[in-house]
């Protein structure tokens, strides 16, 4: 999923690595990396650009004191220490985050490639007579 985040400086597209409904909060927050800082941003500041959800994302439903709903890559949803570690900038957790982000970028590129509209002229242009 990609979002367009309107920060104080400008408008930039970001890759979403997780979606969270924190305890006692009815609005979703999106996990992004901005200028090498990982943070949760409120839906108030974003527009969703591409809403395709990765097939391998996990879901965690309120089995802790921090959130009621969490959706994202495996470690984010299944390892509470990783959830905390990415915000506290633990080196190991940042490596996992960046690895999963890279995998998601590759997946989105492939998805974009296969979702392109192919016309008859496109096919003909590839054929050599």
Regions found by a protein language model. Name each.
Residues 13-15:
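Residues located in well-ordered beta-strands
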Residues 2-4, 17-44:
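Basic/aromatic-rich interaction segments and small domains that mediate binding to polyanionic partners
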């Amino acid at each position: 999923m990609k979002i367009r985040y309107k920060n104080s400086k400008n408008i930039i597209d970001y890759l979403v690595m997780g979606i969270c409904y924190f305890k006692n909060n009815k609005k979703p927050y999106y996990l992004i990396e901005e200028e090498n800082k990982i943070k949760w941003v409120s839906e108030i500041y974003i527009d969703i650009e591409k809403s395709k959800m990765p097939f391998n994302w996990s879901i965690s439903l309120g089995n802790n004191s921090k959130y009621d709903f969490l959706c994202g890559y495996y470690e984010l949803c299944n390892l509470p220490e990783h959830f905390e570690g990415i915000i506290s900038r633990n080196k190991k957790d940042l490596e996992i985050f960046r690895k999963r982000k890279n995998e998601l970028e590759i997946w989105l590129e492939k998805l974009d490639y296969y979702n392109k509209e192919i016309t008859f002229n496109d096919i003909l242009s590839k054929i050599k007579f």
